[in-house]
């Protein structure tokens, strides 16, 4: 059976923003979450929930969405780069989208029970700000980053208990990690306040890790930045967030892109803008000038009488965005510079030129003549 289109599954347009996609997923996740659907419709609701989660995971990731937009389902490998729609991690995306809004109803942060009846917690997501140049954003790059990580404590072998001792079953929750409270007609399930959901208490914590069972360290990750990425976009590295508890899945790492200010270009979507300074002689007489692009040099032919602020468009000399079929354009804005620090001889030549131009009147300076007439009308 063919998979449904991810955009159709979430009920959003193909150009939907990240926020629109997240809102649509939240709505569907709330509607179809298994804890809200019991009885005859439970199986269908679970399938719908998994479909929505899979669509959200693909479309909320810049790289995966770009691949899906270009190649469809064939462009995304379900065995790489993230959690699948099923398996023991199937409900992680719900916690990511909703946080702990429904903690008292569904359990804190979307946790599940492990094989021993203990609460299983998904690890927290981490964020990492990466600054790159405009050139790197346009062409993409492969790079490495170092992020905080956790290793199992070698002193206690990850148990959190002092060597020679062991963790005990929590007497408050009898090892379940949860307690049940009755409020009126409702029975509410909450995380055990004594063991914080682990189902165990440690009478004598390991001194090396303070009972955590893990030691903070660092690890190096390979990161592929797609060509055309823009300011504020995020790359998700699945499973590289904080580790889960009691065998729960790790959170994700979100790498947020920041682009350094460029000396020449300003980016606007897929388009680039730059200011080209020229002298009054070049502006007056015209001629060919060289302008920079991200791919090298290009040439613009200036007509005679080019005015300050005139814009020239070079098609295809912008940036090809991650979800664009064609590159944007480069807009060159002319800035006519007034000469400074003139010699007396140069001043004399300019005065002579000015006198000569005044004789031509409107023919040489049509805008000045029009402006003068408007000023006269203002003071009539």
UniProtKB/Swiss-Prot annotation:
Residues in J domain copies: 5-72
Keywords in alphabetical order: Chaperone, Cytoplasm, DNA replication, Metal-binding, Repeat, Stress response, Zinc, Zinc-finger
Main location: cytoplasm
SMART domains named in the record: DnaJ
Annotated spans, Disordered: 357-380
Pfam families on file: DnaJ, DnaJ_C, DnaJ_CXXCXGXG
Top-level taxon: Bacteria
CXXCXGXG motif repeats: 153-160, 170-177, 192-199, 206-213
Zinc finger residue extent: CR-type: 140-218
One GO MF term attached to the UniProt entry: heat shock protein binding
Cofactor binding summary note: Binds 2 Zn(2+) ions per monomer.
Cellular location(s): Cytoplasm
Similarity annotation: Belongs to the DnaJ family.
Role played: Participates actively in the response to hyperosmotic and heat shock by preventing the aggregation of stress-denatured proteins and by disaggregating proteins, also in an autonomous, DnaK-independent fashion. Unfolded proteins bind initially to DnaJ; upon interaction with the DnaJ-bound protein, DnaK hydrolyzes its bound ATP, resulting in the formation of a stable complex. GrpE releases ADP from DnaK; ATP binding to DnaK triggers the release of the substrate protein, thus completing the reaction cycle.
Name of the molecule in the record: Chaperone protein DnaJ
Name of the encoding gene: dnaJ
């Amino acid at each position: 059976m063919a998979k449904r289109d991810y955009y159709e599954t979430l009920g959003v347009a193909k150009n939907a923003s990240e926020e629109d996609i997240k809102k649509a997923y939240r709505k569907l996740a709330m509607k179809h979450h298994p804890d809200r659907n019991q009885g005859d419709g439970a199986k269908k609701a679970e399938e719908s929930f998994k479909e929505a989660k899979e669509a959200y995971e693909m479309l909320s990731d810049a790289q995966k969405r770009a691949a899906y937009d270009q190649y469809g389902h064939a462009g995304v490998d379900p065995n790489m780069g993230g959690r699948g729609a099923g398996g023991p991690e199937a409900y992680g995306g719900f916690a990511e989208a909703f946080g702990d809004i429904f903690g008292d109803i569904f359990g804190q942060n979307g946790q599940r029970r492990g094989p021993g009846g203990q609460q299983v917690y998904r690890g927290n997501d981490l964020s990492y700000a990466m600054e790159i140049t405009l050139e790197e954003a346009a062409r993409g790059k492969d790079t490495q980053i170092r992020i905080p990580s956790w290793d199992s404590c070698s002193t206690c072998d990850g148990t959190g208990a002092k060597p020679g001792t062991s963790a005990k079953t929590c007497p408050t929750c009898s090892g379940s990690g949860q307690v049940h409270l009755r409020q009126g007609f409702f029975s509410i399930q909450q995380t055990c306040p004594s063991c914080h959901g682990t189902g165990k208490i440690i009478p004598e914590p390991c001194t090396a890790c303070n009972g955590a069972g893990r030691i903070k360290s660092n690890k190096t990750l390979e990161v592929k930045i797609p060509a055309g990425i823009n300011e504020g976009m995020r790359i998700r590295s699945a499973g590289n967030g904080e580790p889960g508890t009691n065998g729960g899945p790790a959170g994700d790492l979100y790498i947020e892109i920041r682009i350094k200010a460029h000396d020449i270009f300003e980016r606007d979507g897929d388009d680039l803008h730059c200011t080209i300074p020229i002298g009054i002689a070049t502006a007056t007489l015209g001629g060919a000038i060289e302008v920079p692009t991200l791919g090298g040099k290009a040439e613009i032919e200036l007509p005679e009488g080019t005015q300050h602020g005139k814009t020239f468009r070079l098609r295809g000399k912008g940036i090809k965005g991650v979800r664009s079929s064609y590159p944007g354009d480069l807009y060159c804005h002319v800035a006519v510079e007034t000469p400074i620090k003139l010699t007396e001889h140069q001043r004399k030549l300019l005065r002579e030129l000015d006198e000569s131009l005044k004789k031509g009147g409107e023919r040489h300076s049509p805008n000045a003549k029009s402006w003068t007439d408007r000023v006269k009308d203002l003071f009539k």
